C-alpha cells in the first residue's frame, strides 16, 4: 500500500509539473504571437511542443501503468533542452516569486546604470559647453544723422552734399528751405532722423534710370523728325519718338530734349569775334523807312544821326519817283549806304 501511495504521489507530482510546463509554453506562445512575422520558427516549435505534451498527458491519463514512461517522454520530448537554446522557460506558482524578484533586481540595476550613464553624459556636456564668451562685446555703431537739402529745380538728378558740422548732435536736425522769391510764405522743412533714411535715399538714387546721352546720330534723327513734322513748335514728343524709331527712347526724354532745342533756337546769334583794336561794345543798327537807328541793346549814351550823301544823277524824273516808291529793302540795295557819325 505504501508503494502504491508513493507511486501515486510521484505520478501526481509529475502530472502537475507537466501541466505547469504546458501552461508556461502557452504563455510563451501568446508572447510570440505578437511577433508572428518576425519569429515564425519559434512559434512553430512552441506549438508543436504544446501539442505533443497534451497528447502525452491524454495518453498517460488513459494508461495509469505507463505514468513513468509518460513523465520521461514528456520531459524528453517537451523538455527544456530544445527551448533552453532559444529562451528560458518560466515556471509558475512556486518559482514565480523568485523570478519576479530577479526581474525587479535586474530592472533596478538597469535603472541605476542608466542614471549613472545620464549623469556622466550631463557632466561631459557641462564640461564641453563654454560658460563665458572670451571675445569682447562689439562696440555700438553710432551713426551720425545726415541732412539732405531739398531744392525745387528742374534738374533730373541732384548730387549729394557733404555733411555740415553741427554744435549739438543730440537735438533733431531741421532744415527749412525757401523755394524762390516769387513765393511769399511757402517753405519746406525737411527732417532726417538717422542713417537708415540716408541709406534708403542713396539706394533710390542708385536705382534711378540713367539719363539719355544724345549722340550726334540720335540728334540727327531728331532733327530729321522735326523737319518731317513741320518744326519744333508743331511737333509733339510722341510723334517725334514714333518717327525716330529708337529702342528704349521714352516720351519724357524726347520732351526734355525738345524743350532744350526750343530754348537753343530762341537764343540770339553769337557776336562776331572781335580784334583788340575794336570797341568792346558791338554797335547794332536796324533800318526803318530808310532811317538808321541804333538798337535798344546798346548801352552807349551817344545819339547817332544819318548823314545823307549826294545821290547819283538820274536822267528822268520818273526814275526818281519810282525809286522813292520802292520799299526800304529795295532802296537800300539801289542807294548808297549812308555813313553814320556819332553826335555828342
Swiss-Prot record:
InterPro entries documented for this protein? Homeodomain-like_sf (IPR009057), HRS1-like (IPR044787), Myb_dom (IPR017930), Myb_dom_plants (IPR006447), SANT/Myb (IPR001005)
- Acidic residues bias locations: 97-106
- Cite the GO molecular-function annotations of the record: DNA binding; DNA-binding transcription factor activity
The entry's DNA-binding region feature spans 237-262
Going by the UniProt record, its keywords in alphabetical order are:
DNA-binding, Nucleus, Transcription, Transcription regulation
Q: Where is this region: Disordered?
A: 90-122, 156-212, 306-344
Residues in HTH myb-type domain copies: 206-266
Question: What is the annotated localization of this protein?
Answer: Nucleus
Low complexity bias located where? 178-188, 330-344
Provide ranges: composition bias, Polar residues. Answer: 310-319
A GO cellular component annotation here is: nucleus
Source species, domain of life: Eukaryota
GO BP field? cellular response to hypoxia; cellular response to phosphate starvation; regulation of DNA-templated transcription
Protein role: Probable transcription factor involved in phosphate signaling in roots.
The protein's name in its UniProt record: Transcription factor HHO3
